[in-house]
A protein has these predicted regions:
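Boundary at the C-terminal end of the N-terminal hydrophobic targeting segment
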Residues: 27-34
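An amphipathic, aromatic/His-enriched active-site/gating alpha helix that lines ligand/cofactor pockets
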Residues: 34, 70-86, 98-101, 107-160
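N-terminal secretory signal peptides that target proteins for export/translocation
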Residues: 1-11
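Weak global preference for isoleucine
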Residues: 24, 42, 51, 65-66, ...
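N-terminal secretory signal peptides
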Residues: 34-94
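Bacterial N-terminal signal peptides
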Residues: 12-26
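Generic detector of low-complexity/intrinsically disordered segments
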Residues: 7, 20-23, 151-152, 156-157
Length: 160
């Protein structure tokens, strides 16, 4: 009876070891793959309103990034960047946000259809040697929550 039981236990242990090895090897393969590239920031509606919550002690850095973004759009040779600049306004709210964060409101209307509004992509086009430092300052400036995006569709133009 013991002889009949031992081969069954060995088989079960063998199957468990095989399963564990398969899992470990699979995890290693998944880990070794390249990270997917970020999707472009393309607005789905006629325009967008973006609220950014910026840490109070990083306001100067964020203001600098917005200035660099304006410069990047202005000096770009791409026609869609000129169109983006023409319809993109950034405001700073007088009221504080969560945890005392400064609130920045970007209004993009009309949005350029199919254009990528990723700030770091635009900065990288204009300032390739500075982009790592700019990205670091940009990323570190956000509070929690970092912001909120609203894709907007025109309901009524009161002037028409």
């Amino acid at each position: 009876m013991v002889r009949r039981f031992v081969p069954v236990v060995r088989r079960r242990v063998g199957v468990m070891v095989l399963g564990l090895m398969t899992g470990i090897c699979s995890a290693g393969v998944v880990h070794a793959q390249d990270a997917p590239k970020a999707n472009p920031y393309i607005f789905a509606g006629d325009g967008a309103v973006l609220l950014n919550f910026v840490k109070a002690d990083h306001v100067a850095d964020f203001d600098m990034i917005i200035g660099k973004l304006k410069d990047a759009l202005a000096k770009s040779e791409k026609p869609e960047r000129k169109q983006q600049a023409a319809s993109w306004k950034v405001f700073k709210a007088g009221e504080a946000g969560p945890g005392g964060a400064a609130i920045y409101v970007s209004v993009v209307y009309p949005a350029v259809k199919g254009a990528d509004y990723t700030v770091t992509t635009i900065l990288a086009e204009a300032f390739p040697t500075e982009v790592q430092d700019l990205y670091k300052k940009y990323a570190e400036s956000f509070a929690n929550p970092p912001g909120n995006l609203l894709n907007i569709k025109l309901l009524s133009d009161m002037a028409k």
